[in-house]
Curated annotation (Swiss-Prot):
Swiss-Prot/TrEMBL GO biological process terms: translation
Keywords attached to this entry: Ribonucleoprotein, Ribosomal protein, RNA-binding, rRNA-binding, tRNA-binding
Keyword Iron appears in the UniProt entry: no
PROSITE patterns given in the database record: RIBOSOMAL_L16_1
Name of this protein: Large ribosomal subunit protein uL16
HAMAP family: Ribosomal_uL16 (MF_01342)
Xref: InterPro entries: Ribosomal_uL16, Ribosomal_uL16_bact-type, Ribosomal_uL16_CS, Ribosomal_uL16_dom, Ribosomal_uL16_sf
One example GO MF annotation: structural constituent of ribosome
SUPFAM superfamilies xref list: Ribosomal protein L16p/L10e (SSF54686)
Role: Binds 23S rRNA and is also seen to make contacts with the A and possibly P site tRNAs.
């Protein structure tokens, strides 16, 4: 599971997830990418499930880049606990995803294999995604 090795502050407030992604919105490393269309908090388990789906489909060929990292702590209180008595303990970590963010990148495989692998990864994720190629985004910029 992905999580920070050490953090300056253990607990964070929730914050707002508004607007489009202005950083991490281009295919920077690979040839193909998986772009988020919706906003969400993505857990490290969801990221790992998508990564396994990609690596299982491309077998030995290709290189995978994970462009997101779960660095936001989410706290939870035990079940049937009364309100008050402080903020709960850190339960898990999430990555804050905005629309337009590239989640995964892939290189070194045929286009049809890359497309199928990224489609399988998208099915594991809680949001709608689209598959983009490096040349598609370069033409738009």
């Amino acid at each position: 599971m992905l999580m920070p090795k050490r953090v300056k502050y253990r607990k964070q407030q929730r914050g707002h997830n508004r607007g489009m992604a202005h950083r991490g919105n281009t295919v920077a490393f690979g040839e193909y990418g998986l772009m988020a269309i919706e906003a969400t908090w993505m857990t490290s388990r969801q990221i790992e499930a998508a990564r396994r789906a990609i690596s299982h489909h491309v077998k030995r060929g290709g290189k995978i880049w994970i462009r997101i990292f779960p660095d936001k702590p989410v706290t939870a209180k035990p079940a049937e606990t009364r309100m008050g008595s402080g903020k709960g303990a850190v339960d898990h970590y999430v990555a804050v995803i905005k629309p337009g963010r590239i989640l995964f990148e892939l290189a070194g495989v045929r286009p049809e294999i890359a497309h199928e692998a990224l489609e399988r990864a998208a099915q594991k994720l809680p949001i709608k995604c689209k598959i983009v190629a490096r040349e598609d985004l370069e033409g738009a910029a």
